[in-house]
Amino acid sequence: MRTMATARQTDAPGSKLGLLSVFVSTLFQLSGVFMLSPLILLMLKKAEVSTTVAGLFAASTWLGIFIMTPFASIVTQKMGRRATMWLSSVMPLIAALGYFTTNNLGVWLALILIAGFADGLRWVLAEAFIAEFAPPGQTGRYIGAFATMIGLTFVIGPTLLAWIGPDSNDAPWVVITLLTTGLACTALIPLLPPDHDTDTARVGLNGLWHAVVSHPVIMLAGFVGGFFELGLASILPLYGLTLGLGASAAALLVSVSGAGSTLVALPAGVLADQFASPALGRRTLMTAFTGLILLATSASLFVAHHSWLVWPMVCIWGAAGGALYTLAMIDIGAREKGLSLVNSTAVLVLTYTLGGLVASGLSGALIEHTLTVGFPALSLTVAAIGLAALLHTKRSADR
């Protein structure tokens, strides 16, 4: 963005290689993860596990991310960013191998938590790497492009699963290949100079609290985005099955949500940079996208009897939810660098993950027991609270 500090080490040799390696490694790793996630849910349903229990398994991924994220800046401070990224790529591969070699649900639960820990580390570091490597004046563009690519992985993973078939013996091998390729590309990330604030940045729980207090509305936007983009996406296969869709169509709901994220993230990031006041522009766009979520979610009251409504609804959830996260990350990238950037990114990921954890943890039971009342009520409440808070903040800023 135009307000990005020019002192950032983006002109250092290897910054282009850094951007490329982070983009490509994340593309392959997340494609594997988002192919694996619906595959696990469908395997659980095939084993006649209840929808409520399957939803709790989906929530365990977010629980792992939620537990690890507060400590991401501490781990990074101790190990360094490259070593931590390498660790975060190895752990999901080990977890995937475990899923395919055992049928013990207790082991699966432990592996899901471990993979969640790794996802939390990589998530924070990948976002911070993009902001660190981006050329001055183009941070919004690159963060938007990265978010678009992440949305693309939502499409690639489930689409591969639907194409190969959830019951195919080839599906596990494709997952392993994707994760292994992502691990190999992570090794290409170049070294960075030492962080200028290694000894002064607030890290850990103290740093997280400071970031939340300083920018509460940005973090609330992250929560709403996480609820509708990632949290609900994790239970969309269950939602589709409950609505009477087939297994492949239910898995494709995740692709539709991801397609929405893919199409909107980059334009939202570029548009945010065009306002005379970028900060006010970001808040305006956040308010508009949250209002769109609220409008689309009203369709959940009728989707049980008009199942075609689920397709545009989940597309808007993915598009607007992803845009909220992208705009919040651009806001952080405009203000922070070094370990402070890692820490503030961790806070955004934490609130985003909390939104995902709430959505996946509660929605499974609500879909199973109160599809037409409880699930819509929860979703509408979250959207309404987010919109009210953003409207209040925007009006205060306009005065």
Question: At which residue positions do the language-model features occur?
Answer:
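Helix-loop boundary and gating motifs at the non-cytosolic
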Residues: 12-62, 215-222, 229-243, 250
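Helix-to-loop junctions at the C-terminal end of transmembrane segments
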Residues: 68-80, 165, 264-280, 367-368
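Structural signature of the two symmetry-related core transmembrane helices
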Residues: 83-97, 283-298, 380
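Cytoplasmic helix-loop-helix junction between adjacent transmembrane helices
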Residues: 113-148
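Intracellular juxtamembrane helix-capping segments at the cytosolic ends
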Residues: 121-134, 322-336
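Symmetry-related core transmembrane helices of the 12-TM Major Facilitator Superfamily/SLC fold
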Residues: 172-188, 376-391
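C-terminal transmembrane helical hairpin of 12-TM major facilitator-type secondary transporters
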Residues: 280-325
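A late C-terminal transmembrane helix in Major Facilitator Superfamily
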Residues: 339-368
